[in-house]
Amino acid sequence: MSDMEDDFMCDDEEDYDLEYSEDSNSEPNVDLENQYYNSKALKEDDPKAALSSFQKVLELEGEKGEWGFKALKQMIKINFKLTNFPEMMNRYKQLLTYIRSAVTRNYSEKSINSILDYISTSKQMDLLQEFYETTLEALKDAKNDRLWFKTNTKLGKLYLEREEYGKLQKILRQLHQSCQTDDGEDDLKKGTQLLEIYALEIQMYTAQKNNKKLKALYEQSLHIKSAIPHPLIMGVIRECGGKMHLREGEFEKAHTDFFEAFKNYDESGSPRRTTCLKYLVLANMLMKSGINPFDSQEAKPYKNDPEILAMTNLVSAYQNNDITEFEKILKTNHSNIMDDPFIREHIEELLRNIRTQVLIKLIKPYTRIHIPFISKELNIDVADVESLLVQCILDNTIHGRIDQVNQLLELDHQKRGGARYTALDKWTNQLNSLNQAVVSKLA
């Protein structure tokens, strides 16, 4: 464990000079310092003894100061590791009383940010909510806008995870108000903060599948030019944009967005890059592209990643119209692929696409073909075959009719040929018109 992690990423050697008073060489300060470091030495081997020892730092300090603040940070961490959450909250509330005058504004801000980041690893949502709300209450008097914004953003993310959208919208309204001019317009000087708010709001609309509001906000976020956004924030925005486009059937736009999201996540070191790469593969298959998504320089290193391998194999089976292999991969890697709700949402469409391609190839030599035979070849029920045939006939992929009594598909090759000749005739007429126009101009 590094010193940085050891002290909530705010260790004693950070850019903070202890502000001793003129009598900083007096005995009480030396005693405090010794007591603090002796306590810290106990932390790993005997955390309970360390807690008692840190308590002595608080008793020795008299007036609130930096050593008491540091001791409380350590006590919060130890209690967190011991899962003694009520005591941890008590110590955190005690630490928040120090931020008004006992330590500098920058130091308190860095420390609280680090504590909140550390505690956010907890899966106990109620505990996190109490932490964030307690921090916001303490900040009412402290007037620290940056810390208020960051804490509210964390609370908003918590509400998003808990699907408490009413509470999240209230947070979003407050965040928006903090980034507005006197005229009520977005303050473009606060572009980076605005993008953070948009990212949070876009995630909410994506979860709610509210594409109308999502689209407007997504376009708005891409037009903010006054910010140097964190790649993680842009990754979130582009991922949500990709989901929006995919749900609207705009597969090429979705592919572009997922690729941009993947690159941003990759740059920020976010594990979300793997998930986004899966979405990129999904969009690639839905747009019926013959290009392998792993041919790109950015995606190639992940081709054999265990998390991605199933999707890589799925692409291969899909491009080869190998329905048996496609279904086998889905079955073998069910949790890897189907546990993601967004992928699961679109797998049926992929199956329909590959079944349609196999179906077209299967029926090509025939004028009449038994539906049970198609059912056996596609490995789906007769009812599902009929449903697929109806869809293909309606969109003119197949020219024919279904004889349900005799369970036959009767194909009209003449009609299909007629349609081809009609298209050729139209094309010939267009060429003649173009030729006449060129001759007229040259005359």
UniProtKB/Swiss-Prot annotation:
Q: Which UniProt keywords apply?
A: Cytoplasm, Nucleus, Phosphoprotein, Signalosome
SUPFAM superfamilies from the entry? TPR-like, Winged helix' DNA-binding domain
Q: How is it modified after translation?
A: Phosphorylated by CK2 and PKD kinases.
- What are the protein's GO molecular function terms? transcription corepressor activity
Q: What SMART domains does its record include?
A: PAM, PINT
Pfam families, per the entry:
PCI
Keyword flag Phosphoprotein = yes
Q: Which InterPro entries match?
A: 26S_Proteasome/COP9_Components, PCI_dom, TPR-like_helical_dom_sf, WH_DNA-bd_sf
Could you name the domain of life of the organism this protein comes from?
Eukaryota
Family named by the database record: Belongs to the CSN2 family.
**Which proteins does it associate with, and in what oligomeric form?**
Component of the CSN complex, composed of COPS1/GPS1, COPS2, COPS3, COPS4, COPS5, COPS6, COPS7 (COPS7A or COPS7B), COPS8 and COPS9 isoform 1. In the complex, it probably interacts directly with COPS1, COPS4, COPS5, COPS6 and COPS7 (COPS7A or COPS7B). Specifically interacts with the ligand binding domain of the thyroid receptor (TR). Does not require the presence of thyroid hormone for its interaction. Interacts with CUL1 and CUL2. Interacts with IRF8/ICSBP1 and with nuclear receptors NR2F1 and NR0B1. Interacts with NIF3L1.
Listed name of the protein: COP9 signalosome complex subunit 2
